[in-house]
Amino acid sequence: MQGIVSLVLTASVCWLGGASDQQADYRTLMANGEFAKAREVIESRLLHDGTVSGPLRVEMQFEIERMERIRKDFTKKRQDVVDFVKKYVPNVVPQDLDRWEKERSLECMMIDGEKRYFNNAARNLFRIDKECLRIWNERHADEQAKPPAEGALDLDAHIRTIREETLRQKQAYSEPVQMRIRYTITVKPDVTPPGEPIRCWIPFPREIPHRQTDIRLIRTDPADHRLAPDKDLQRMIYFEKSAVKGRPTVFSAEYEYTNYGVHVDIEPDLVKAVDPQSALKPYLEQEYPHIVFTDTLRELSKRLVGTETNPYRVAQILFAWVDENVPWASAREYSTIPNLPMYAYENRHGDCGIQTMLFITLCRMNGIPARWQSGWEFQPPDDSMHDWGMIYFEPYGWVPMDVTYGLRKTDEEKLKWFYLSGMDSYRLIFNDAISQPFTPKKDHFRSETVDSQRGEVEWKGGNLYFDQWDWDMHWDVLKK
């Protein structure tokens, strides 16, 4: 079921009610927010329509799951939003909310006749709307002015050192950081019948020459495990453990690895177009359902790029546009979004993966090979799941990029563009592609259908979604 056929629903933030015919196509019903009716239609067809088989049957089964996931992501009512916003905008009126919704700064949708807001919609408003962001920054100015915690990473100083050292040593990699990770998944009590085996996949780092090395598995719980081969583009370590009545089921993996900072000093005039029929061809093509060259994105690309033909300068144009026009905001689960780049374009916000997917798509449309990379980021004392990517410039080869970190605030041109051909040392890389099969394969739908950073859990009765288990990432910097 990992190769589920994705369904392109409307990318509109607020889905408006419409069709009411019980026999209307379930796609139309879903697009109109009539989830209960859509479910009735799907279940009826699955039960009575003998032509529903193979991929179509899997697709329809997943749409039932997708609607349930959307419900979990959209639990807030308008009053919940008002209560939060009033802390910062005391005189807020209904017309303000209407305007923010129309501008897609306040994420909502109609579900079975009731307007529901994304769980983080209110907080995101103060990331997306420029005036609200200004108010937020003024209110939190004292916090932002506080000196960094002792031992905190100075990111810009760190990447400056990487650039200086790679230039001095005349190589792309420098400033290695050795880390120890202990990752734990705790399945909540009684989510399966007692005695039933629970299957668990925990993300595990890939060995990447010169970039991520010296990976050493220290211990696991349970001791029996299956480690996926390094060639897996979404690498996992797999466990099984039987559920015990009234008790959580715990899985963990502890390991060490070393990650290197990267910087490739690009001379734009040396960069040339790649052969589209070479081994790079897969990284120039569409990958449904997300990397799709829609007419809307083609028009955007044409407008942005104009007559520029140099691949590096085209990438700069696209990188700067995403950095400036698609601010970071907390995102709903990717499995609820039919097309991530179109979501970014139409809503003008997105988290790191949504920003990255848009940039990758625009690059490929312009003949620039680009691909996904993801895992976790660390800015001691902080950490987070994070998505970034790789981009190919001839004759330099593959180099890392991070459009979320964007243009650095500096007058030094080379340092400003660091994250278009470089990466800091504080990364943990699990994935080099999207939506890849696991070893061993998962029998039921994945909780995360695109990325793989938290893990996956299931039993013979079905997938265990994120609200049925918890994850914990504990880490230590051993050497830098």
Q: Where on the chain are the PLM-derived regions?
A:
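Acidic low-complexity segments
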Residues: 33, 229-237, 243-346
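Intrinsically disordered, low-complexity N-terminal segments that are enriched in acidic
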Residues: 63-263
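Active-site neighborhood of thiol-dependent amide/isopeptide-bond enzymes
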Residues: 307-388, 392-395, 409-412, 416-420
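Alpha-helical solenoid scaffolds that mediate protein-protein interactions
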Residues: 45-46, 52
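Bacterial Sec-dependent signal peptides at the C-terminal "C-region" and cleavage site
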Residues: 9-21
